[in-house]
From Swiss-Prot:
GO terms for molecular function: 2-methoxy-6-polyprenyl-1,4-benzoquinol methyltransferase activity; demethylmenaquinone methyltransferase activity. S-adenosyl-L-methionine binds at T74, D95, N123, A124. Its EC number is 2.1.1.163, 2.1.1.201. This is Ubiquinone/menaquinone biosynthesis C-methyltransferase UbiE. Belongs to the class I-like SAM-binding methyltransferase superfamily. MenG/UbiE family. HAMAP family: MenG_UbiE_methyltr. It comes from Shewanella piezotolerans (strain WP3 / JCM 13877). Pathway: Quinol/quinone metabolism; menaquinone biosynthesis; menaquinol from 1,4-dihydroxy-2-naphthoate: step 2/2; Cofactor biosynthesis; ubiquinone biosynthesis. CDD domains: AdoMet_MTases (cd02440). Methyltransferase required for the conversion of demethylmenaquinol (DMKH2) to menaquinol (MKH2) and the conversion of 2-polyprenyl-6-methoxy-1,4-benzoquinol (DDMQH2) to 2-polyprenyl-3-methyl-6-methoxy-1,4-benzoquinol (DMQH2). GO terms for biological process: aerobic respiration; menaquinone biosynthetic process; methylation. It comes from the Bacteria. SUPFAM superfamilies: S-adenosyl-L-methionine-dependent methyltransferases.
């Protein structure tokens, strides 16, 4: 019997064995974790805060709800949700990368955000939570780094309660040619140089730019959510489609 050919996937523009990608992505985020928030502000000129604010508003969280902030990294969304759901609610900040979790935990504790937040190291493709557990799941700028996106979306559907809502905030495809050209120039020429200057790591930011280009476009991601079983799926483009917020429900 011949050996089975290993499954392959993309790591930026490179083709790698699927089982290698998680470790390679981990290396990127171990490298950038300490300066992640600074780089977000610098690279997006602070606009990422507006994108995240719109995500929070679209989530419709209420006191007492259970929220999963998946690939939550340094905890920007978790901090907002913690205030909204209150002491009777619960926010779980989950991330596959322990360096990002550590930065997020320290940041939120320094802000006095404790009590209704817990931290879980978890793989989005196989979430370690019971079925029908969360009212809301958000994943912001994390899905493009997942090896098997279909498995991750299915896993999110499983742990959502009936009536629950998934929101995916992710880089996408600009709608207009001029914006695409400007964005490509910025992503591949400017971002790596910023990474080299601020984090001494140009390679990680070159990967991040490539991972954005390899991520499914708006309509493709919408169909992936529908195929997984989500209903009433729609998306909102922001900043000409550089970023899109996809939303779907479990019924």
């Amino acid at each position: 019997m011949s050996e089975e050919t290993p499954k392959s996937t993309h790591f930026g523009y490179k083709t790698v064995e699927a089982e290698q990608k998680a470790d390679m992505v981990a290396g990127v985020f171990h490298s950038v974790a300490a300066k992640y928030d600074i780089m977000n502000d610098v690279m997006s000129f602070g606009i990422h805060r507006m994108w995240k604010r719109f995500t929070i508003e679209s989530a419709g969280a209420r006191p007492g709800m259970k929220v999963l902030d998946l690939a939550g990294g340094t905890g920007d969304l978790t901090a907002k949700f913690s205030h909204i759901v209150g002491e009777k609610g619960q926010v779980t900040l989950a991330d596959i990368n322990d360096s990002m979790l550590k930065v997020g935990r320290e940041k939120l504790r320094d802000k006095g955000i404790v009590g209704n937040v817990n931290y879980v190291q978890a793989n989005a493709e196989a979430l370690p939570f019971p079925d029908n557990h969360f009212d809301i799941i958000t994943i912001a700028f994390g899905l493009r780094n997942v090896t098997d996106k279909d498995a991750a979306i299915a896993s999110m559907l499983r742990v959502l309660k009936p009536g629950g809502k998934l929101l995916i905030l992710e880089f996408s495809k600009p709608k207009h040619d001029i914006m695409r050209k400007v964005y490509d120039l910025y992503s591949f020429k400017v971002m790596p140089k910023m990474g080299a200057l601020i984090t001494q790591d140009a390679d990680s930011y070159e990967y991040l730019a490539e991972s954005i280009r390899m991520h499914p476009d708006q309509e493709t991601l919408k169909q992936m959510m529908v195929d997984a079983g989500f209903e009433q799926v729609n998306y909102t483009n922001m900043t000409d489609g550089i970023v899109a917020l996809h939303k779907g429900y479990k019924f």
